[in-house]
Amino acid sequence: MAFRKLAVAAAAVTLLSACGDNNLFNATAPTISDVYTVFALTGTPPAYPSALDTYFRQPVRVDGAGSFDVAFDIDPSGKVIIYPVKLVVRTLTGERRIGLMRVTGDFDLVTSAPKATYQTDSALVVSPHEVVVIEAARNGSGDACQFALSPNIYTKLIVDSVAVATRTITLQTVMDPNCGFRSFEEGIPKN
């Protein structure tokens, strides 16, 4: 039995080597910058986009399918509450791991996602101009990183402004669409 496993492993290595793809673990897509306006979860109609799908780079409405990464609300003091999807809805397909991390410093100077533990089990309350990095696992069935060595897509965001009267939040983001890559620098990432 051990010989059979060894033979299968050797065949797999040979097959991968024969493909001749020297860029197997290189990023292929550039980082992407966007600006969004989303609505608060409370005090707005449910059809309004109150969440963000970081991989597809679009504000979306909160739905029972959990087809978003984070949702936003405004607390009584005007700060923004960022919720990972699992704190907003429970889906039939199970939880997708979304982590949040507050990062000190200027938005433009945060050039890569930190290699640390991301907060996955609680919301994050931020003031305008605070930087947050989102770690979104994208390794579900049919997902972007289903077969990648690292299942995570990283996005940094900053709340540019909060309009309490209209319950809107303006965000600026930079997303690295390459599975496992952490760079927020312009162009195709190297790490």
Feature locations, PLM:
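Surface-exposed, beta-sheet-biased, low-hydrophobicity segments with strongly acidic/polar composition
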Residues: 19-191
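Sec-dependent bacterial lipoprotein signal peptides
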Residues: 1-19
